[in-house]
Amino acid sequence: LDLPADRFACLSGPNLSKEVAQRQPAAAVAASESHSTAVKVAGIATTGYFKVFASTDVIGVEMCGSLKNVVALAVGMSRGAGFGENTAAMIETRGLAELTQLGVAAGAQAQTFAGLAGVGDLVATCGSPLSRNYTFGANLGKGMSVDEATKVSNGVAEGVPTTAAVVALGEKY
């Protein structure tokens, strides 16, 4: 589509849907190629319990929002297999480092990965049973097949198809 980029923004951050629906305090990042569009979206989306910050790093915010799901699958698998905090921290930390390198190679800003869209979303997604990707990974770690884990999952685990994209991006960069 040949549409003006300043008409679009993406929103990402540590936003487990159940907690947002319960109006628990949360924050996110609105990113647009246009700073004024990002600021406008952030202003419209901010409430008394939901704070939205503006960014022009669309590549970084979008990559954080999707790629962290692959790390959450891996953390879930480690938990399902019976491993503890050290293993989870290792996977999250190395995962963040590798996602940051991949993002920077694709044109993202490294600091985006250290903010709400990056480490914030990663912590929420990798550490909560409310996370579909974490739960899906935990079921795989317990020995379920992908088909079995899909049947018992509550919603789509975006990290499963995203894994192939991460491999392709890694080969490209």
What are these language model-derived features?
Residues 55, 68, 72-79, 83, ...:
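NAD(P)-dependent Rossmann-like dehydrogenase/reductase catalytic/cofactor-binding core
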